[in-house]
Amino acid sequence: MMKRFDKLLEKEVSGYKGKHSDLISKAPALYKLMTRLLDDPALPGRLSPLVIASIAYFILPEDVIPEEKYGPLGFVDDIFLCAFVADKVRKEAGTDDILIRNWDDKTPVIPLIEQILESEEELIGDNKQIIMDYIGYEQLET
């Protein structure tokens, strides 16, 4: 039987003490947030494909900053994308509650999302557009 992907993520990031380790440790919780949002009836329907894209991005072995090459540090782009999508969801839903009720971590989710988005350049450099192109963001937005 295959383990749940969030459990595999936990194993992969546990014990990581390198650059951005505080954020890398949140990868499993952010992945779980995306999966739970899909089941939330308050998720604006037009955002479902974007949420699905953020989940798929986590699972893809060869993304913009691949884990295969960078180890756990390679999750920074996945984490950024989840934060970007989560922020879009809360803005479109018109409430933080949709994120709060689907969050499964001790760290408060809203400040975490804001911290990740404010750290964009430090986390992913100038790769935001490449990540958005990779998931087909423009097509998902139409």
Where is each model-derived feature located?
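Betabetaalpha-Me/HNH-type nuclease active-site subdomain
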Residues: 45-48, 56
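A generic alpha-helix surface/boundary motif
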Residues: 31-32, 49-50, 63
